[in-house]
Amino acid sequence: IKVKAAILRSGTDRPPEDYKNHLTRLAALQAYNQAGLGPEDMSVAEVHDATAVGEVIQIENLGFVEFGEGGPASLRGDTKIGGRIPVNPSGGLESKGHPVGATGIGQVFELVTQLRGEAGARQVEGAQNAIAENGGGLHGVEEAAACVTILGR
């Protein structure tokens, strides 16, 4: 399994209405560019969902859906295993736990397991590329820091 991109960015004082310049979105765009891939190339994602709205916000920021479509996409089942872009097959932070300081490596472990085809009942079939998004702290209206990692077979 190869690391195709790893981006760490710091938060800004952007106004809340400037959501298209969200820290995670900018980090994701940079990661996609570094990897030579796009959202459509991702087979599976692990995102920081310490709160229920986390998945909704981050699937928009990662470019899987248009802004404002994250909630409907999740409700349709687009983000479940077998959906258009499986998100958090590990169960996510609210389900498996949020070991602050180790959350990111837990996400990467899950994605490596997926890409190796070793995830058992949670396996995303045929996974080729995977993306992890992790954030922490608070700076204004977004994370103080965000990391986006893209892995591939």
Model-inferred region functions:
Residues P99-A119:
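Active-site-proximal alpha-helical scaffold in enzymes
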Residues I1-L26, Q30, D78-S90, S95, ...:
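Condensing-enzyme catalytic core mediating Claisen C-C bond formation in acyl metabolism
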Residues H22, L26, Q30, E40, ...:
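Feature representing long, continuous alpha-helical segments
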Residues P15-Y19, D49-P72, P99, L138-C147:
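Short glycine/threonine-rich loop-to-helix capping motif typified by GTGT followed
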Residues E55-P89, G152-R153:
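Glycine- and aromatic-enriched membrane alpha-helices
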Residues A6-G11, S43-A52:
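A short beta-alpha structural unit
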Residues N21-A35, E110-R116:
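Short, well-ordered amphipathic alpha-helical segments that serve as non-catalytic structural scaffolds
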Residues P39-S43, F67:
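Short acidic capping loops at alpha-helix termini that bridge into adjacent secondary structure
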